[in-house]
Each structure stands twice: as C-alpha cells, then as structure tokens.
Amino acid sequence: MEPGALNSRVEMANFIEVNSIEKLEKLFEESNEKPVVLFKHSVTCPISSGVYYEVSEVETDVNLVIVQKARDISNEIANKTGIRHESPQAIVLKNGKAVYHASHYDITAEDIQRVESGE
C-alpha cells in the first residue's frame, strides 16, 4: 500500500449547486423520471463539513443547496416536502415526493445510495 493511501478519499458524487427556484422546480419534475438527491449544506458548520465528505461517496448527482446562499431554496424545499429545515440535511425525491430524509450524523452515503438505486 502506498504511503498516505489510508487517508486518501475518492469523491464519487457529482455535486451540482442549486441556485434558483426554477432549478429546484426542474428537479422536482425530474424526480418523476429518476430519483433526485438533495443535500442542504452549511459552509460554516463543522458537522455539515464532515457529512459533506460522507455524501461525496454517493455514486450519483447530488444537488447541493448551500443554505447561506440559498435560504429561499431551502425554505421552498421545506414547503414542498413538509420536512422541517435542518442542515446538514439529505433528501431523496421520487415522483415529486420525499422518500428519504435524514439530518446531521444520521446521513449516510449507504442509505442515500440504497434509496436512490431503488433497493
């Protein structure tokens, strides 16, 4: 094993920043065709930073809502799903509805991957 190999992490998720209500609306529509992963992230929260690395192991697109820059989007997610805002928070949408949600250290890449892949 090469030196430092144990500390290296491979980021597999493709993070896509959600920066408009219009983009969010499109994601809800896309969830009718395939599962959509949303991740609410606080850039000032150490817990959120740790969970970001966990979510980076998901092998799919992860739609990133940076709560400091997109409070309106975060609030709209809460309104549309009925799930109280938290950060960090992961939500998987299918057919316009949340089929999975977790916050803080309850968020795992394994759970997101399982729900996203339909297992």
Segments from the language model and where they lie:
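Structural micro-motif
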Residues: 81-94
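N-terminal leader/targeting and pre-domain segments
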Residues: 2-4, 9-32, 119
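Amphipathic alpha-helical interface surfaces
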Residues: 47-51, 69-73, 77, 88, ...
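Local sequence-structure signature of Cys/Sec-based thiol-disulfide redox active-site neighborhoods
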Residues: 26-58
